[in-house]
Amino acid sequence: MAAIINQRVEQGESSMGGAKPALLHRITGHVARINDVILLSKDEGVWTASDDRSVRLYLKRDNDQFWPSIHHFMPVAPTSLYYSEETYKLLVGLINGNVYEFSVADDFNSMTESRKWTCHAGPISGLGFALSSELIFSCSRDKSIVWHCSENSNKMGSYLLENSCTAMVIDLPFVFVGDHGGHVTVLRIVDNQPNLVSKLSAHTNAITSLTWDGNKKVLYSGSSDHLIIMWDIGGGRGEAYELNGHNGKVTTLCAAPAAKRLFSADEHGKLMCWDMNCKRVETPEWKTSDCCQKCNQPFFWNLQAMWQRKVVGLRQHHCRTCGSAVCGSCCDNWTTYPPMGYETKIRICNDCNARMKDNPQNFNLTPLAIPHEIHTGITAMHLQETLGLLVTSGQNRVIMIWDVRSVCSAPSGSQ
């Protein structure tokens, strides 16, 4: 029978205490999937882009309800938004590869088309604006990244990837682009020329979201493989830490640099808040072997050993904490191990199980994340950390605004 280590941990509070996101508002009225949302920081409003071709701005009224102040229809469905509150400029990326720029009125009652770029041959999957260099970036499913000058609309440069672009974040001179192959390409833009710095490869499925912590110089990537990876870009040592808490495709990520938090959401409606102020441990590489590295029993593909010993081959498993290739009998123990990113139970070998039991002081099993069920898949999310507000859009076409101040201000783990 499978053993469970430190069962009390499941009922215990996380390193951030018992804080939970609090629902403040629900916005209904959309008739199609919502592809992107942006929460304003200076006004109480939400931008949305939907498959019904609409771009809407909801503002909070005196009756505490949100109503559309702007309701603009695009030629085809918008897939991505970017809004600059400093310049009142709205960028809208479309499914046909076009990018529109709008000037938004000061009273938020109208928006006027300023420019249009026909720069891609596939759906826009990411937009960005670097105010300091006056560059507008866009990436697309057509595998390309393009940047234009925001002053004269001229194309300043481009870069072609091997796979379709799925997500992008910008912190010039660096541009991070996730693709359908599960890679993150790191570019350095010098005099509008792209230079390949690195390609980060650890995911086994498409990248779905990227977010950047500029304070710690850390990049977070979410993927269809249910995994989140924290890439320590600024550390210079190539360290990467896995975060395992989702049982479905991770759809969107939001970093809260000041609070040292990470918000993630998946296709099943699970919202996670991760404590990124604690010491984490890198996951080991999985070892390869033709026999169990504990009892030496052959695995089912090791025909020679099976024939010589006259035994039936066993199925291979891996201990998640040491990476050993083991049989089922040698790893029938299950536990969480938050320092390594495992917030749900994972399989460990008998040796690691014994070490955890004999030296519990060396294995802190306190949860380092707060899970919250929204009960509908999340399609988009945006955080305004200074306000302590988070907005999500669900597969049920409902927009929810959450108060996350208690989560962000809660005490967290040690460095």
Curated annotation (Swiss-Prot):
InterPro entries: WD40/YVTN_repeat-like_dom_sf, WD40_repeat_CS, WD40_repeat_dom_sf, WD40_rpt, WDFY1/WDFY2, Znf_FYVE, Znf_FYVE-rel, Znf_FYVE_PHD
Assigned GO CC terms: early endosome
WD repeat intervals: 71-103, 119-148, 202-232, 245-284, 373-403
PROSITE patterns: WD_REPEATS_1, WD_REPEATS_2, WD_REPEATS_REGION, ZF_FYVE
Deleted gene: phenotype: Worms exhibit disruption of coelomocyte endocytosis.
Binding site for Zn(2+) 1: C292, C295, C327, C330
Superkingdom classification of source: Eukaryota
Protein name stated in the entry: WD repeat and FYVE domain-containing protein 2
Species the sequence originates in: Caenorhabditis elegans
Primary gene name: wdfy-2
